UniProtKB/Swiss-Prot annotation:
Pfam families, sorted: LIM, PET
Protein name, UniProt field: Testin
Alphabetically ordered keywords of this record: Cell junction, Cytoplasm, LIM domain, Metal-binding, Repeat, Zinc
Species for this entry: Mustela putorius furo
Gene name as annotated: TES
LIM zinc-binding domain sequence ranges: 234-297, 299-359, 362-421
Bilayer-spanning residue ranges: none
Subunit and interaction comment: Interacts via LIM domain 1 with ZYX. Interacts (via LIM domain 3) with ENAH and VASP. Interacts with ALKBH4, talin, actin, alpha-actinin, GRIP1 and PXN. Interacts (via LIM domain 2) with ACTL7A (via N-terminus). Heterodimer with ACTL7A; the heterodimer interacts with ENAH to form a heterotrimer.
Length: 421
């Protein structure tokens, strides 16, 4: 497919998850409705990952595409219908007999993902070493956590130009080259094994003999004995704590087999979240999730959340923006040359700020313009003017004066306070 055809095919899946309830806003959100170019809900401004959207097939397609044309093709299968690669995630079902008074019942636990190892006991041990709230048991908080991290750590728009908004043919080509490069140089999947199983593959680690020190004359006599008792000492690359014998460890091939991690320590060096499904990106001695690896390579638009492949973009408030996406977060009007106010790290135009976000003056009960001076005490604000910041009893101007605040009112003296009580 040529570039022009690819560009024409691009578009965001606006019907996907439509109407799904927001897990964060609850009934305050009318249901998920994807913004035209932002990756958020138009109704509540939360991301799709915060909504109860059924995305298992879509996520499996996304990860399958990530592994396409890599050494990890064993983790994908192509659908016969359309040839699209699908992620063959390992689902683990454990059955535990539960003794009852009269008979024995079976308690079944399903993990929506588990490390693809033949030894189920090892996989189970791996899961038990994760925080309980992050264990991907079907229907649990941990399963929701995994779903959220899949969306956050591995955005589809970081690897698939068709998931981006209005890329030019030149930008499509640059993105494809970028994806090809990180697949060959950084992408990896962790491997769960017992540390001693890797001795044959990895370089020799430090050996600590049972004896402490010996004289040269005694070395020969002690050599055989120390060889029998010496043990390999392993430590976690992240927390530097020692690994317990018999506990599973995670290896990252790109990092080298002289490094290993506790299951709970295999995290992104930027966001410090568990690397979802052990999918990592390795760069300069650090582990990254997909999102933060890409952030270390390319600027990301704070408006649409996509990587910027254009040479022309703007920087404002320590963030990067496509020129067309430096817009008001409320009304989407372009802010170039306009007055704006940052609200929760999002730029808002002056009219929208006054309408939706401005604090109300306790004196005149009107919104306080963002460019106007104000007086603030606790959660109350006043225009810093002789008409608004007055004693609630005698109307004396309190600018530059001591005052006594009482539940949204201010007084110039104890006497005035008593008169109003």
């Amino acid at each position: 497919m040529d570039l022009e055809a690819k560009v024409k095919k691009m578009g965001l899946g606006h019907e996907q998850g439509f109407g799904a309830p927001c897990l964060k806003c609850k009934e305050k959100c009318e249901g998920f409705e994807l913004h035209f170019w932002r990756k958020i809900c138009r109704n509540c401004k939360c991301g799709q990952e915060e909504h109860d959207v059924l995305l298992s097939n879509e996520e499996d397609r996304k990860v399958g595409k990530l592994f396409e044309d890599t050494k990890y093709t064993t983790l994908i299968a192509k659908l016969k219908s359309d040839g699209i690669p699908m992620y063959k995630r390992n689902v683990m079902i454990l059955t535990n007999p539960v003794a009852a008074k009269k008979n024995v019942s079976i308690n079944t636990v399903t993990y929506e993902w588990a490390p693809p190892v033949q030894n189920q006991a090892l996989a189970r041990q791996y899961m038990q070493m994760l925080p309980k709230e992050k264990q991907p048991v079907a229907g649990s908080e941990g399963a929701q956590y995994r779903k959220k991290q899949l969306a956050k750590q591995l955005p589809a728009h970081d690897q698939d130009p068709s998931k981006c908004h209005e890329l030019s043919p030149k930008e499509v080509k640059e993105m494809e080259q970028f994806v090809k490069k990180y697949k060959s140089e950084a992408l990896g999947v962790g491997d769960v094994k017992l540390p001693r199983e890797m001795d044959a593959q990895g370089p020799n680690r430090m050996y600590i003999p049972s004896g402490d020190r010996s004289t040269p004359a005694a070395v020969g006599a002690m050599e055989d004995k120390s060889a029998e008792h010496k043990k390999t000492q392993y430590s976690c690359y992240c927390c530097k704590q020692s690994m317990k014998e018999g506990d599973p460890a995670i290896y990252a091939e790109r990092a080298g087999y002289d490094k290993l991690w506790h299951p709970a320590c295999f995290v992104c060096s930027t966001c410090h979240e568990l690397l979802v499904d052990m999918i990592y990106f390795w760069k300069k001695g650090k582990l990254y999730c997909g999102r933060h690896y890409c952030d270390s390579e390319k600027p990301r638009c704070a408006g649409c959340d996509e990587l910027i492949f254009s040479n022309e973009y703007t920087q404002a408030e320590n963030q990067n923006w496509h020129l067309k996406h430096f817009c008001c977060f409320d009304c989407d009007n372009i802010l170039a040359g306009e007055i704006y106010v940052m609200v929760n790290d999002k730029p808002v135009c002056k009219p929208c700020y006054v309408k939706n976000h401005a604090v109300v003056c306790q004196g005149c009960h009107n919104a306080i313009d963002p460019e106007v001076q104000r007086v603030t005490y606790n959660n109350f604000s006043w225009h810093a003017s002789t008409e608004c910041f007055l004693c609630s009893c005698c109307s004396k101007c309190l600018i530059g004066q001591k005052f006594m605040p009482v539940e949204g009112m201010v007084f110039c003296s104890v006497e005035c306070k008593k008169m109003m009580s």
